[in-house]
A protein has these predicted regions:
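C-terminal/peripheral segments of proteins
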Residues: 1-74, 79, 83-226
Length: 226
């Protein structure tokens, strides 16, 4: 099969400069679904295109949940995330739990970058860079928060960021997202608001608050294409 899902356009040895924003998780999710089957039909392709599975959440939580201390591990947020199937379903609390925790952790890990952005044009490290970093670098000087006396570790940041969101009230994903299809005039009366829908920018059903798939198409080849 041949697939494309906004992933990187070339390998690391490509000799020329190019730029753009690339999505590292949707392409891998397509490969996941297609390699699980020897043959696929239209129904399977429909299911795949509507999938809310997040490979980002699966890979990040494999590290983050493992390093939670005993007190945090028994919190309702942690228990919910341990049972989660990593799908961003509309009525689920766990996608919101994960997003809040990962955002807090990302800001805590790269705090020196965030605090310098008013003076220097520094981009935020991509989420895949962050996940790859914590998978391969359990010990690094980047985990230390320079503004504190203590020398923090990866475990410290994961537990501190979890405690930071542990008292947050968690709403179902659709309520938290408040998905909207806005009219060109941006007038609410002409728009569709408060859509009860799942998905995330890193899943194949990449529905966000105001952006998402506008149409889907499946073509079945054969003697009578449809």
């Amino acid at each position: 099969y041949v697939s494309s899902a906004n992933q990187y356009s070339a390998t690391e040895d490509y000799p020329y400069y190019y730029n753009g924003n690339f999505e590292p998780y949707r392409g891998r999710t397509v490969h996941k679904y297609l390699t699980e089957k020897d043959t696929v039909d239209v129904a399977y392709m429909k299911m795949m295109q509507n999938s809310t599975f997040s490979m980002l959440a699966k890979e990040a939580l494999a590290v983050m949940l493992h390093l939670l201390d005993s007190n945090n591990a028994i919190h309702a947020h942690a228990k919910g995330l341990k049972r989660w199937d990593f799908h961003y379903d509309a009525n689920s609390l766990n996608p919101v739990r994960f997003d809040k925790w990962f955002t807090a952790f990302h800001q805590m890990l790269w705090d020196e970058i965030y605090t310098q952005q008013d003076q220097v044009a520094l981009p935020n490290p991509d989420v895949w860079v962050t996940v790859n970093f914590i998978e391969k670098n359990p010990y690094s000087k980047f985990y230390d928060i320079k503004s504190t006396v203590k020398i923090e570790t990866l475990s410290d940041l994961i537990n501190q960021s979890f405690r930071q969101i542990s008292d947050d009230t968690i709403s179902p994903l659709a309520e938290e997202k408040n998905a909207q299809i806005l009219h060109l005039t941006r007038l609410d009366a002409f728009s569709k608001l408060d859509i009860n829908v799942g998905g995330t920018k890193h899943s194949l059903n990449a529905m966000q608050q105001k952006f998402g798939p506008s149409w889907r198409m499946i073509v079945a080849l054969g003697d009578t294409p449809e």
